């Protein structure tokens, strides 16, 4: 194996290393996987308008997220059950994110608990939350995240039911017997039963609350002072509702194309959300980020930062903590290079004028009518 030169190469290594059920769980999307492909392809249709002859000898990639200073606008998205990828699981990811000076989001469905992740040492961490039918479970989880020093809640709002992930159905996906969903240990919610289709789909149907609505976003604010990021917004309408309901931020997300197929790529939905937010709250994006150029494009469209998920899991599977560190370093280095070659020395200098989107190309064509 030669030197790894980009983030995508880790996926091929992960595929060789992991059991099929684990790899398919991480890699697959919903139904036809159109959105899964589109999350990547939409980035490739956005082009650069680089500015030249600008002194780029010093480049500052630092930024602030919810008041926390981080080294770069690239953060770790929540991904479930990381010990299926590597025995160190979320511990390794937490250490790599902290070493890179960025934020890690821990999944509700992690195979390490909030307390265990906190024990890895200092670091800025967010907690991704699913709202369970039993609100006492939710309250307990939020309390534990607060006590463990987590700084924000990323509330997933696009999963009243689990998307139809056909690979998981074929594989009859279930959490391996030696692992548990550590945040639910002792609650009878830590294990996943074998099912006729996907064990996770059955688990979600049994535990996650389908009645979840904006009133629950309000309720969460009554039980915690932590800022709440609404994760899973794709439209202007829901952006305005997020603002009206006191969200601290929005994550434009289609759940890694694992929920509703044929929704737009997140990078395609981003500008609509940013415009509707009117600067009243920060807008982040996840889904399909594999290059530093992708990070730049997202920021040019108004994102305050990006979250990466699958690249973290695949690099974790391939090389543990060192793999995750390497992915974060490669993305950082590529992003820095993109800034330099585009003529930007700070994030504030990245503007909409630095890119051309499909809609820009269309509006530039004079109408024949």
Curated annotation (Swiss-Prot):
Q: Name one Pfam family in it.
A: FMN_dh
Show which residues form the site (Involved in determining the substrate specificity of glycolate oxidase). 109
Task: Summarize where glyoxylate binds, as residue positions.
Answer: 25, 130, 165, 255, 258
Family matches, as SMART domains: IMPDH
Inactivation phenotype: The mutant shows deficiency in glycolate oxidase activity and is non-viable in air; leaves become necrotic within 7 days and plants die within 15 days. When the mutant cells are shifted from high CO2 to air in light, they accumulate glycolate linearly for 6 hours to levels 7-fold higher than wild type and 11-fold higher after 25 hours.
Where in the cell?
Answer: Peroxisome
InterPro entries xrefs: Aldolase_TIM, Alpha-hydoxy_acid_DH_FMN, FMN-dep_DH, FMN_HAD, FMN_hydac_DH_AS
Q: Single Gene Ontology BP term?
A: response to other organism
* Cofactor dependency: FMN
Q: Which residues bind FMN?
A: 78-80, 107, 128-130, 156, 231, 253, 286-290, 309-310
Q: How is the cofactor bound?
A: Binds 1 FMN per subunit.
Q: How does it assemble?
A: Homotetramer.
Designated name of the protein: Glycolate oxidase 1
Taxonomic path = Eukaryota, Viridiplantae, Streptophyta, Embryophyta, Tracheophyta
């Amino acid at each position: 194996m030669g030197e790894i030169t980009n983030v995508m190469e880790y996926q091929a290594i992960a595929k060789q290393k992991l059991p099929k059920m684990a790899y398919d769980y991480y890699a697959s999307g919903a139904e036809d996987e159109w959105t899964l492909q589109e999350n990547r392809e939409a980035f490739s249709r956005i082009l650069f308008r680089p500015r030249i002859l600008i002194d780029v000898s010093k480049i500052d990639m630092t930024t602030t997220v919810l008041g926390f200073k981080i080294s770069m606008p690239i953060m770790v998205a929540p991904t479930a059950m990381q010990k299926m990828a590597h025995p160190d699981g979320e511990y390794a990811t937490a250490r790599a994110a902290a070493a890179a000076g960025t934020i890690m989001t821990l999944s509700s469905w992690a195979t390490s608990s909030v307390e265990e992740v906190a024990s890895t040492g200092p670091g800025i961490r967010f907690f991704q939350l699913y709202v369970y039918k039993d609100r006492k479970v939710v309250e307990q989880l939020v309390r534990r995240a607060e006590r463990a020093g987590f700084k924000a809640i990323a509330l997933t709002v696009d999963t009243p039911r689990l998307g139809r992930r056909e690979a998981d159905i074929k594989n009859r996906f279930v959490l391996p017997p030696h692992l548990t969903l550590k945040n639910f240990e002792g609650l009878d919610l830590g294990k996943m039963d074998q099912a006729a289709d996907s064990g996770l789909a059955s688990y979600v149907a049994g535990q996650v609350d389908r009645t979840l609505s904006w009133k629950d976003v309000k309720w969460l604010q009554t039980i915690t002072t932590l800022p709440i990021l609404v994760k899973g917004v794709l439209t202007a309408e829901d952006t305005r509702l997020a603002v009206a309901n006191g969200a601290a931020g929005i994550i434009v997300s289609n759940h890694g194309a694992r929920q509703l197929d044929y929704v737009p790529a997140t990078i395609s939905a981003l500008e609509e959300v940013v415009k509707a937010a009117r600067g009243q709250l920060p807008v982040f994006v996840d889904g399909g980020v594999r290059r530093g150029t992708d990070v730049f494009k997202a920021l040019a469209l108004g994102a305050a930062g990006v979250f990466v998920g699958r690249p973290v899991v695949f690099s974790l599977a391939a090389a543990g903590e060192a793999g995750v560190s390497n992915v974060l370093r490669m993305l950082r280095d590529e992003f820095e290079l993109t800034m330099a070659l585009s003529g930007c020395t700070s994030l504030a200098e990245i503007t909409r004028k630095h890119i051309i989107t499909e809609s820009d190309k269309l509006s530039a064509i004079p109408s024949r009518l």
